[in-house]
């Protein structure tokens, strides 16, 4: 049974008055009749829907669609349906400024719209689409299930240091012959060792010299040593030409140590080569900066580069050994320590990884936290995380188990922390609902500046980049995150202006583009499909290379399989979106909505915002409901704004379109355009109710609930001051509509209904549960709407806009604080919260995005196929 409350005005939470009186009002029973009551005096009242008996209770019988949109596949591709006209359908950056880009992107239909396969127009569409992608999905799933301490490529440099370890029993030869065998089998055709696919002079030279030293030390494979020396003689000059940002970790100390080892072995090497002078000078400077006493007492990143360093007190250093026996997870540093001390824990660490990697050890190991964190980041940014929710949850549980209030580094149980992995983990843990404190970043702040490692010599771009991303996920009062955001923003913008967005830890396809997107479109304004489309173009897959002591690759973090799955998935979604948009445009034209000042471009923008947030094929009903409600609500508002309509006329329109059985358009004689809108609204309500997943109460229940949502919205329009519309509040034609709070709430209600979350939609209409959350989200939308209007004014009031920006920022922080933590809050479904978050973020995006950039994103997301 459905009940209606009859408040005298709109509830206070949504801008109306008399909330207490509203709660005291009696209820009417609404059974089979669809005619709503009229309160005493003939004034129209918004309807409020509730289940159960007169006490508002009753058992929950709704069918939760789980965000799936139910039976949308059966209808989403058709343009018309029987009886209905057509198919259903910051610190900086965006916080205060409209993003402007010089080159506009003209958005238009492609010459030949891609046709969907026939199977995409029937109920089996989603299942068959999944079947086509399933091999790639299974490949990725297999990778994720194989994760242990990190998949990582071998380092010839580190393997050479392991090969240099003499037998611990005093007999002649190497302790680890498997390392020698790996070196012998890994020389490249040009005589060098190193990354075969990417030539870096730093990488090739240090790897090659290390391998020549190791083979010479044991008087093995003279021909290979000769080839290696020939390569070094021909390419040593390149060291002076290399970018300093791509210099491997500790190169200034490690390479001169190898040169001295070569000299001691009598190797024919150009020791006086001009390219070596600068390296030796930097070595002396760096050694002078290293606090020798402190490095023996407090764990620092220096422990990672001990090999060849003079004047070490090993008895003191052994106290700083990691629990796995390594020195900060470095095989080369640990091998050097083993040579100097014969320590059993050092031996156990080296022996374990030699066996695991069949002789060729990596430059760092383990890298378990690094891999677990970065995998989740890549899957989410590529837009394919929905296929791997269980695996992602397992990854985040793993990271959370090893999280500490001091931070983390690339491996568990580290006694040295760094900001890059800490920031990435903080961001993902918070987004996934884990309770993490931002005070962790106090460990990386000194004198108003943030750093990655204690004692670092240069600042890493990616460290500050991930710190900025983490700082965007802030709650009210978290000043440390505000400071981190300001500092990282200024650092990154300065490097951007200088054209020096190169990093010392990664050689990626488009790091400058990644940084620019994050600064221009922070978390509040980053829409899922826009982010995915952008990152697909930035992700290098197999070609992304990391910089440690040598170049290395992380095959479960960077690989072609993720990229191929992301491309195919994006293109399949895009093809469906194009088909839906065609139906939506047809619906718009057939209903004559162009006569009200709306344009096909307005429809395109409305659909884009919906599809950019709700993009999954099996959520078509939610996506099209969002777009259609947005278009029609905006059309109705514009129509009555432009005519400066009276309250009586608005009431008459609402009565004819929403209260009369099947709509009484004849009641609007003399107002032809009003009749067109009334008819369109009635038909849309019918269509939405038909295409919503069935519930126990039946289709009539859904139909009435959708009408209640529209009545609530119409009442808000009628109850405006003096019953008149302010023509100045209408946004300029062609601009991206940023809805006010009433329209945002209407969209949220109907999206929830179309998703099958009937109880949640009813709660919103009743506004009796979770009202604070709904009011907050709606208030943010209203502020964004006001900002959009002010930004279009020729006489911009910057003071007012800045004040609104501050209110929006605080509101978004409060919204994030409510949305993100994992709490047992049964008042509002988590998926309903996500609906509100999507709507608010779409408004944030639209209020701050320039028309040029908006059109570019529309082109990329809706029209331009990923190649």
Curated annotation (Swiss-Prot):
Pfam families: Terpene_synth. Residues 51-64, 99-121 have a biased composition (Basic and acidic residues). SUPFAM superfamilies: Terpenoid cyclases/Protein prenyltransferases, Terpenoid synthases. Substrate binds at residues 286, 504. It is found in: Plastid, Chloroplast. GO terms for biological process: gibberellin biosynthetic process; gibberellin metabolic process. Its EC number is 5.5.1.13. Its cofactor is Mg(2+). The keyword Transit peptide applies. Its main location: plastid. Residues 1-35 form a transit peptide. Signal peptide: none annotated. Belongs to the terpene synthase family. Catalyzes the conversion of geranylgeranyl diphosphate to the gibberellin precursor ent-copalyl diphosphate. 2 different ent-CDP synthases exist in rice, one being involved in gibberellin biosynthesis and the other in phytoalexins biosynthesis. This is Ent-copalyl diphosphate synthase 1, chloroplastic. The gene is CPS1.
